Amino acid sequence: MTTIVLIVHGLIAVALLGAITHQAMAICAPPHAKPHSFFGHFRAIPAERFANAIVFLYLASWLLGAFVYLYFKIDIQPYLERDRHWHAMGFFDLKEDFVVIGLGILPAYWLCWRRPVDGQNDRMRMVLTVLLAFIVWWSFLVGHVLNDIRGFGS
C-alpha cells in the first residue's frame, strides 16, 4: 500500500514540478520576449491559470507525503542513521522545514494570483512563485536522492 501511495505522490510531484516551473519561468521571463523565442512560449499561456492547480497539487502532494513520511520514519530512517548518511538526513530535515514554510506561504501565493494585476502584486507574485518553485524543486530532488539511497522494498 505504501509503495502505491509513494508512486502516486511522485506522479503528483512531477505535475506540480511542471506547473510551478512553467509559472516561475513565465513570470520571470522578459515582458517583451519575442513570440517564438524560448521565453515567449512561456508567456503565451497566462501564468494565472496555474495558481489553483498548483495549490491543489501542493496540498495533495503534502498529504500523500505525510502518509509516506510515517513509513519513512519507522522503516527507512533507522537504516540511514545506521549507515551514517548524515548529509542525506540533514537535507531531508531541510526538506521538512521547507515544505512547512511552503504551506505557510501558500495562502499568500493563492491570494496574490487571485487578485487582478494592478502593478502592485507583480513583485510579490514573482517572489512567492520563485520561492515556492525552489521549495518544490528541493523537495523533489531530496526525495529522489533519499529513495535512491534506501528505497522502498529494499
Identify what each model region corresponds to:
Residues 1-154:
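Polytopic transmembrane helical bundles with strong interfacial aromatic enrichment
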